[in-house]
Curated annotation (Swiss-Prot):
This is DNA damage-regulated autophagy modulator protein 2. GO terms for biological process: apoptotic process; autophagy; cell population proliferation; photoreceptor cell maintenance; regulation of autophagy; retina development in camera-type eye; visual perception. Plays a role in the initiation of autophagy. In the retina, might be involved in the process of photoreceptor cells renewal and recycling to preserve visual function. Induces apoptotic cell death when coexpressed with DRAM1. It comes from Rattus norvegicus. It is a multi-pass membrane protein. It comes from the Eukaryota.
């Protein structure tokens, strides 16, 4: 059995590979058509103009769905491993909410380009990155709380390093973007897709976009740490029948049917 066939380990793998492919395909298309500059454009700038906008939107929406599925499986796994510890239960619920909000932000970024509805696009980006960062932080705390009985110390330290990486990238991005957009660098800076080294604010722009890409890769690394954990879990769906036919008016006992959800039983 291949590693991705064990449990639900294919979910975080698919999430990272698909999202990375989304960024790369839209980047290559935008560069080929000269819609953006090759030197570190904003990720969403590569999905601003058609036809790459269509590809970016569809693929990023699918990535958001994969993200919600991965976050939900992680929630169920932590809940099953720690059904009675109050602190872990609260943190786990908080992580679920933060993760879903982050995926909602990702979907907003996919569907509302900055050239169409800038405010909605920015709100989606802030939601995706901020809630995603807090989600990583909460999951790292959970990893600390569950070591060494359930989680190894190595997993905790790897996730902690990824959270620090994410935090440094987020701080750099927020600082430089705040200076860039609050300064007088031109009225069209918000919608600007092409930058030259001699343009005012060019250095701030490059630092901001580099931090955005860096932050995204810290997310990729964090979700990849779920692969081994997800090899140890399978979800099942249960169908509860209320009658022998679809027209029974009186409930009668019927044997329920149980099948695996997306994966075979882990042996």
């Amino acid at each position: 059995m291949w590693w991705f066939q064990q449990g639900l380990s294919f979910l975080p793998s698919a999430l990272v590979i698909w999202t990375f492919a989304t960024f790369i395909f839209s980047y290559i298309t935008a560069i080929t058509l000269h819609h953006v500059d090759p030197a570190l454009p904003y990720i969403s700038d590569t999905g601003t103009m058609p036809p790459e906008r269509c590809l970016f939107g569809v693929m990023l929406n699918i990535a958001a769905v994969l993200g919600i599925a991965t976050i939900y499986v992680r929630y169920k796994q932590v809940h099953a491993l720690n059904p009675e510890e109050n602190l872990i239960i609260k943190l786990n619920k908080a992580g679920l909410v933060l993760g879903i909000l982050s995926c909602l932000g990702l979907s907003l970024v996919a569907n509302f380009q900055k050239s169409a509805l800038f405010i909605v696009h920015v709100c989606g980006a802030v939601l995706a990155f901020s809630m995603g960062s807090f989600y990583m932080f909460v999951q790292t705390i959970l990893s600390y709380q569950m070591q060494p009985k359930i989680h190894s110390k190595q997993v905790f330290w790897v996730r902690l390093l990824l959270v620090i990486w994410c935090g440094v990238s987020a701080l750099s991005m927020m600082t430089c973007s705040s200076i860039l957009y609050s300064s007088d660098f031109g009225a069209d800076i918000v919608q600007k897709l092409h930058w030259n080294p001699e343009d005012k604010g060019y250095v701030l722009h490059i630092v901001t976009t580099a931090a955005e890409w860096s932050m995204s890769f810290s997310f990729f690394g964090f979700f990849l740490t779920y692969i081994r954990d997800f090899q140890k879990i399978t979800l099942r769906v249960e169908a509860n029948l209320h009658g022998l036919t679809l027209y029974d008016t009186v409930p009668c006992p019927v044997t329920n049917e149980r099948t695996p959800l997306l994966s075979r039983d882990f042996q």
